[in-house]
């Protein structure tokens, strides 16, 4: 029992300890509440202090907003505190979880530490005892002592000399026997047996000594393994010459021994080879080893040159030890050899001689002078394998060239004969011994690069001779050329054999720029293609020649540009022409060459070939200070020849591209072809047969040439500007050659008797070396027209075809335009011809203002003008003939309008060159005539304008607003003038508008204006009565017309929508409800439309006496809408009054028809809720209105429509009563529309106005 009790007590006391409680980083909740309370008190205190300080500075809204923000922030903080307090109720459980997590992490750490400690126990292997040495124990047991090395501490006995000599003799005997019995000794072995070893020599390669390890005589190769040969010693039979420091291959006295480390490695390798392959394997191994060492010595010398010589950076070396091959890529900085395209290979040929192969730009070189010099250096004599016949080498690809460093050492295309075996060799002395020469790699590179540079310059020289003469290019040295780059300049062009780059001696900036381009890859190749592509040497030479031509081009262009700049020509470098535009210029040269080839086939070889000229040329653009902005002198020069070509052209920029709109080439005559006319000579100029060239030599580009070129170019520009202006005006003309025409013949042919005031002046030629002619390309034919250029003045004559310029009845089919350049900046223009059958006032004011003179006696007129070119020629839109043709247009308009007015019997009160005053009569009211002024256009693009006699303009700002009738008529004129302007601007798509039709329209529109005038008069009369009378009756009337606030109930206005559409608007004002200040304004719109009605009368010559005119359609449809239902009584009154008028007019017409026995008219059928075909459809523009109005010859029948059933009975009754219709007295009802003649318009308007007054009176009652 005590034990059990004791055990129980131990169990209770050994219970597990409590989990440790975590209190780190925990803050009591009381502290948080304390801190937040203090912070809230601090913020409230600060806010109250701030608000008390800014009482006067801030508004109450801003202060309240500030205090509200503080309260909101504090509220958010206390919400967080409240959240923490709520969470505190369950914080004990969370704390237990934290304690558990911490305890689990501690237990995990203890278990991991236990695993690491257990694993560390395996690292005590070194503390174990070693195993027993059984082998040593057995030796002791068996021999009585361990077998230990002595390390030569115990000296052995030396061999005696006799023993050694005996052994060596035995070895010599064994070696002699074995060499005698062997059949596979290499042919190149030269061996000697002595001193117990066999000394084997291979000339110019190596010497090796071998021996055997026993005295066995081996006669069977299969038993060779029983007694193999062993390596004794080795040395190279070549090396560096201590006297010259160069490599010697043909002197056996110079040898090279291997260092100890290399000797040991070679001994081990040779013994293995002798054991497995015998002497043949020995030869192959040492032969390769010797060749590798030869190539190594060469590579070492090349590396020395690459570091410490002038060759540094100018060649690349690729040394391959596994193939005993060296590839030297010279001119490594040049793009031609950048990818190993020009290189020399050094290696061992099939005869074991040091040999080479030379590749120039991817082609194998064989048999040229450079190869002969290299053969002497390498002591080689070449012979072709095909019995001495030289074969061409194939071009290798880029991949093959790059892989050339991996080629086989056997050069199968050629063989080499060592000079020692040739008794005829030049390097053999009199004793028959070969003179040993050191191999100089610097000399090898010099020979290669010099010969390559020489071949390039020779090819450049030969190709330059095909383009230039021998005086322009000559060979100074194998590496230098003398070039004639301009008539007065020459330079030396050379190549640097060391680098392969070209250069000029004492270069100018232009030559330096060309040198940089020559030594750079062609621009056609990108950087990627340069690294990957193969650039043939022929392409490089062609590119060099092109750049030389470009140099000549730039130098010649600079000289020409300097001469032009000194003679006041301005260069323009902005213009860049495309190939298509340049072809327009070269087309002149092609046509001229074809023409010269046809005319003179024998001398065509003496001219410069056009194809060579066009291969390289440059175009420059020049202009004079006073020239128009788009005119230029074009100069073309070529790098092949010193000749230059000249054009005068107009060039403009269209959508960013420069376009040649017109051009003329200038042609030149030689001195032997010069011909001048005497001042009094009037016969036709015949061109002599002379050679005409499009180019001029550089020697003739002197000051006199450019002075004459300036005058000629200016004349050609003026000539073309006039030609173009005539073409823009669509005027047909013929340009006469002033040098060849006869005045009397021309004028007599066209019956022109006028003596020209400006006689043709005698012009003299300027004494210059070259006569300048111009070829005109305006004609489509291939013939070339020549103009004598060296003149001080310019004269020209045009025959103008009088198509629409003047009426043929009053003039002639041909007019004359004379142009003369009086001075350098003054040009005289004159247009003259016949003018008859017309009497026009031609005052001195017209002559001075319009430069127009009319000679009625001689039936002749002329318009002249003097133009100051210094002020107008440089304007962008200069029209030299503007004044002349504006005056001619005004004269043409005056003649045509007067002719129309006279034929139509319109009263013309006055006329001049500016205005025509006419009288328009009102056929319905004789007291309403109007005086209209027809203002003639100032410009050819302007139209005529209509003005009232008492007004000077059609704008409403200057019209007297007190006269409403004048205002409305002026508005009509404004619409007409607008239509005339639009018709003029679109004249190519529209028909001509007759002035008679316009005048007739003004006559027909008068009744409408008079009707509106009558309405305004009635309203004015009522207003006057209401304002002056104060009795009861008048007060009652005033209350009818006015509202209680004094505002009138009725207003009237006329809206002119278009020329054929007008609108009568009655504005009805009324009070709404009991509020007297609130006014509602309604409007009643009545549309008036003009409709043609010509089929009852035939037109005659006098339109004012004609009864035919327009009908008026009055429509109420726009007013019969839902908003106007409250005016139902008004419309009933209107329709009632109009129906009464219809009945009255019907009776009058019937009575009048019976009394006058007029021709019965067919009844017009009623229409159903739609417009008749007579009703003109409203147009969308003024042009359509007046065009339709002007057509008076078309008869339009009303469209028949089915009437409604409730209208048929009234229609039948009306048609019976109106059996005949008078054309001048028509009044027809069409549902809610009315069709009436002009004389009934006043009655209809009166009835409508009276109805409005009746409605107002009923409303008042």
Curated annotation (Swiss-Prot):
GO terms for cellular component: core mediator complex; mediator complex. Pfam families: Med14. Residues 1-21, 413-435, 1193-1220 are annotated as: Disordered. Residues 1-11, 1205-1220 have a biased composition (Basic and acidic residues). Transmembrane segments: none annotated. It is found in: Nucleus. Component of the Mediator complex. This is Mediator of RNA polymerase II transcription subunit 14. It comes from Candida albicans (strain SC5314 / ATCC MYA-2876). The gene is MED14.
